[in-house]
């Protein structure tokens, strides 16, 4: 996560994530950023073995969809989602015939101002598996936290930026050492069968879950609006 006060060592982060065999990276920027500064960050992650780099960034009227598309063309693993936009739109990758999954630019109206804007679970947030491996991950592991490691705006290392427990700070701690921590890894194995109410839900194996906004570790997510006992969604909470 990145805000106006963040001062991350992106080179160190890129090296350690590659050593951990990380394949997918997401940057969440709660502020605008000039393209030159954004490129300075991305340059640390290029020519490394990352399959996709998703950049969630705040809308800036001076930066056009074409500007983002050209930057994504320069760094083919990168895609952009521009939040807090006045209009919604989707723009296909300039390299879609070569890299059909990445390189796109999407503008969304949703305001994302902090990590508190995460964790909403509704009937639009379910992720249906693409294959047996994806399905079994939902059965055996936690869909949100399995093999995930995060750095919040202050550099604190967590399972998720929205969670409270801190395992160190990237300024003086290693992502590799944190991944060896049994307490950190325990959340990877917290599947839906161990969570109250969720274990009875028919969506449990396709739900992304959330362990940040909860009363305790084994409770249903507070931002989930589904009742599996009467098969109903509370539509008022879905927005």
Give each language-model segment a name.
Residues 1-11, 17-36, 50-62, 78-87:
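Core AdoMet radical
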Residues 164-239:
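Flexible mid-to-C-terminal extensions adjoining Fe-S/redox cofactors in radical SAM and related proteins
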Residues 1, 160, 216:
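Canonical Radical SAM [4Fe-4S] cluster-binding loop centered on the CxxxCxxC motif
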Residues 12-18, 38-47, 66-75, 93-98:
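Short, aromatic/basic amphipathic alpha-helical patches
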Residues 20, 54-56, 79-83, 111, ...:
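A broadly tuned preference for mixed-charge, low-complexity surface segments
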Residues 74-160, 206:
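A C-terminal junction/extension of Radical SAM enzymes
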């Amino acid at each position: 996560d990145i805000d106006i006060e963040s001062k991350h060592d992106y080179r160190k982060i890129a090296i350690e994530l590659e050593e951990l065999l990380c394949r997918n990276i997401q940057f969440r920027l709660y502020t605008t950023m000039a393209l030159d500064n954004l490129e300075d960050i991305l340059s640390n992650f290029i020519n490394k073995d990352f399959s996709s780099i998703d950049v969630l960034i705040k809308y800036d009227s001076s930066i056009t969809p074409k500007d983002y598309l050209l930057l994504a063309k320069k760094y083919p693993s990168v895609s952009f989602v521009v939040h807090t936009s006045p209009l919604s739109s989707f723009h296909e990758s300039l390299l879609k015939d070569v890299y059909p999954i990445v390189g796109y630019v999407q503008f969304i109206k949703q305001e994302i101002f902090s990590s508190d804007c995460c964790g909403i679970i509704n009937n639009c947030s379910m992720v249906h598996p693409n294959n047996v491996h994806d399905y079994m991950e939902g059965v055996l592991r936690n869909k949100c936290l399995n093999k995930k490691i995060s750095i919040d705006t202050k550099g604190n290392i967590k399972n998720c930026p929205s969670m409270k427990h801190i395992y160190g700070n990237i300024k003086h701690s290693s992502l590799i050492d944190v991944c060896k921590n049994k307490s950190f890894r325990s959340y990877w194995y917290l599947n839906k069968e161990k969570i109250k109410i969720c274990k009875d839900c028919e969506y449990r194996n396709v739900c992304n879950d959330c362990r940040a906004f909860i009363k305790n570790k084994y409770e249903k997510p507070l931002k989930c609006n589904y009742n599996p006992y009467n098969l109903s969604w509370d539509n008022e909470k879905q927005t």
